[in-house]
């Protein structure tokens, strides 16, 4: 049936049924939740069940396990994750039925069409920065809508439909899809050589993409750029838009001075334009999180949030799931305990920042890391950097690479990485084939008082949660 647009004055309601292929992905669940709240009939499919899909089901979404052509029958639009193959039966059926198919980023752009968009781009720190911006604007009474790649612990979700005019989102550079967005404010945290496989293994193309991202701002838009990152600093002269800088760098427009770490907190002086200076306590560890907080402070200042309200939001921020998530002290037998931290970090630069935060907060503890590399291509491209940063810890357990759909690459697996680390002569890594085997191996590595970091973007986080849930009964798989 051909429907006339004039038959329904509300164009959003004219095509109410939206189906998400790969609905369980971090970038998909938030969009689905916002569309549910807007009143759409949301359905979705995924090969795996997780907490996010279960939450969507409780909110009214129809979530199917596995992919089938029948799942898209009767839908008005199909939203597809970048992880979905072109021969997926649901996509093939949608094409045959001439159902509109939209990439995830394109649907995010559609949501942004009706609000003032704030898009956070960068190789690292997007989720934390986006979350901090949402927290600052919420504390300032602006009630933003947000779509985040991780769970905002205070909200218990990674998305929320607010009544205000601002929409805060992550802008994903990994596949170039951030170039679909047309924000009013663009934040760039840093630029690093990651996801090179999507840019012809050419770092210059990644940098060019960020330049193009800023050109998508309207002439009255604003680019917020981190001056501490040398690649981002180069964008200041290329942006051709209004620019505000932030950083610990003394030349930044919004900057931090007197930065000190106090356990899991960072204390610093926030210096805002017009000479406003306030003391800030950030409830997150690490200098990298100070930079993330400065980005949020700059956005808040631009939108009129009072400085003291910005400071209050930063102090009360309780974090995001799997971003230096302190799971507390856990027993490892014989009355001994270790401190367990779960973190999503999976790039050498992220590992370096997390290790620095851990040592800064707990300098007297032995640093033990259980790491699951993510993607064979990243392990290959960053091989030497991984070996360097992982050789700096006191004890290391490696699981096999989480493939994320990739086929193994010779010389880019956990055993090869362990050999490279061992050759540096600073540590003797332990290698396990399956990530679940960490539960068996860790008791022999850990000592009383250790700080245990479980890190990676694959499924290692579920092992950390399993240990917590089972009361840290090691030795059972």
From Swiss-Prot:
Pfam families: Mur_ligase, Mur_ligase_C, Mur_ligase_M
Cellular component aspect of the GO annotation: cytoplasm
GO molecular function: ATP binding; UDP-N-acetylmuramate-L-alanine ligase activity
Known EC number: 6.3.2.8
Location(s), subcellular: Cytoplasm
Catalytic activity: UDP-N-acetyl-alpha-D-muramate + L-alanine + ATP = UDP-N-acetyl-alpha-D-muramoyl-L-alanine + ADP + phosphate + H(+)
Keywords assigned by UniProt, alphabetized: ATP-binding, Cell cycle, Cell division, Cell shape, Cell wall biogenesis/degradation, Cytoplasm, Ligase, Nucleotide-binding, Peptidoglycan synthesis
Keyword S-adenosyl-L-methionine: no
Keyword rRNA processing: no
InterPro entries with a match to the protein in the record: Mur-like_cat_sf (IPR036565), Mur_ligase_C (IPR004101), Mur_ligase_C_dom_sf (IPR036615), Mur_ligase_cen (IPR013221), Mur_ligase_N (IPR000713), MurCDEF_pg_biosynth (IPR050061), UDP-N-AcMur_Ala_ligase_MurC (IPR005758)
Pathway per the UniProt entry: Cell wall biogenesis; peptidoglycan biosynthesis
GO BP annotation list: cell division; cell wall organization; peptidoglycan biosynthetic process; regulation of cell shape
Chief place of localization: cytoplasm
Family named by the database record: Belongs to the MurCDEF family.
Function text: Cell wall formation.
Entry protein name: UDP-N-acetylmuramate--L-alanine ligase
Top EC class of this enzyme: ligase
Binding residues for ATP: 122-128
Top-rank taxon, per record: Bacteria
